[in-house]
């Protein structure tokens, strides 16, 4: 195994319009095949749709949506004496954000609207209102952790 220590985290630059690193990370999640310009256009147009439909600042709505999506607990598989247990563990802040952004984009892609901008805008609005597939994913993750609470003493 390598012994150089932990790999340094790469820091992203804040995006030009909202001056937010979180928005840059969301753009990076949306981006396919390195097409950053298209990903930016999708996100900014989605934010405009959010502004029109909610009448609020899209950053506030996005922050609320992300708070509603980010999980507090998750389960990790742990092998003990030939059996695999789903052990509930707390999610670290960095991973919470990553999972929230990942679920937001993935469940946006699965929606039925015509354009990705509409899908993303509607998923953000749904998540801000505590509905939608991404919020359901968080609820399911929490349910799994709750159901396996008996194995919490196997934490590492």
UniProtKB/Swiss-Prot annotation:
InterPro entries attached to this UniProt entry: Ribosomal_uS7, Ribosomal_uS7_bac/org-type, Ribosomal_uS7_CS, Ribosomal_uS7_dom, Ribosomal_uS7_dom_sf
GO MF annotation terms: rRNA binding; structural constituent of ribosome; tRNA binding
Keyword Ribosomal protein: yes
Domain of life of the organism encoding this protein: Bacteria
Biological processes per GO annotation: translation
Cystine pairs: none
Chain ranges passing through the membrane: none
GO cellular component: small ribosomal subunit
Swiss-Prot/TrEMBL keywords: Ribonucleoprotein, Ribosomal protein, RNA-binding, rRNA-binding, tRNA-binding
PROSITE patterns associated with the record: RIBOSOMAL_S7
Pfam families found in the cross-reference section: Ribosomal_S7 (PF00177)
Matching NCBIfam families: rpsG_bact
Oligomer and partners: Part of the 30S ribosomal subunit. Contacts proteins S9 and S11.
Free-text function comment from the UniProt entry: One of the primary rRNA binding proteins, it binds directly to 16S rRNA where it nucleates assembly of the head domain of the 30S subunit. Is located at the subunit interface close to the decoding center, probably blocks exit of the E-site tRNA.
PANTHER family in alphabetical order: RIBOSOMAL PROTEIN S7
UniProt record similarity statement: Belongs to the universal ribosomal protein uS7 family.
Protein name: Small ribosomal subunit protein uS7
Source organism of the structure: Halalkalibacterium halodurans (strain ATCC BAA-125 / DSM 18197 / FERM 7344 / JCM 9153 / C-125)
Lineage of the species this protein comes from: Bacteria, Bacillati, Bacillota, Bacilli, Bacillales
UniProt gene name: rpsG
